[in-house]
A protein has these predicted regions:
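A short pre-motif secondary-structure segment
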Residues: 70-71
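Helix-turn-helix DNA-binding module
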Residues: 77-94
Length: 113
């Protein structure tokens, strides 16, 4: 059975970028939390980052073990398809299926679909 994870290109690109920035955004939140007084004017930015992180974490937590591992290889470790195949043994089909599934589910979680 073929999964239909088709979404508009601009939404796909936006969500993919958010997923690729996940690790950096987590670090940013930790930086804010450790020195909140220094970032008084950026409360809105912090809230937006926290919301996006929550959407992504909700989706990651809902995935089965294989999809979760693939998502971490793709978006957290940021392997290319060929790199993931060589270093992690993730097939091309599994790579793209997991990537498309996670992007679709995050877009849906963000109410972009």
């Amino acid at each position: 059975m073929k999964n239909n994870y088709k979404i508009p290109w601009h939404i796909r690109q936006y969500v993919k970028r958010e997923l690729m920035d996940y690790k950096d955004n987590k670090k940013l939140v930790e930086k804010y939390k450790s020195n909140i007084a220094a970032y008084k004017g950026d409360t809105r930015a912090l809230l937006l980052v926290l919301a996006r992180l929550k959407y992504i974490e909700t989706v990651l937590d809902s995935l089965n073990k294989e999809d979760r591992e693939a998502a971490e290889i793709i978006f957290i470790d940021q392997y290319t398809q060929s790199g993931a195949e060589i270093a992690k043994g993730l097939s091309k089909k599994a790579f793209y299926n997991a990537m498309n599934k996670v992007i679709y589910l995050v877009a849906r979680e963000m109410d972009l679909l």
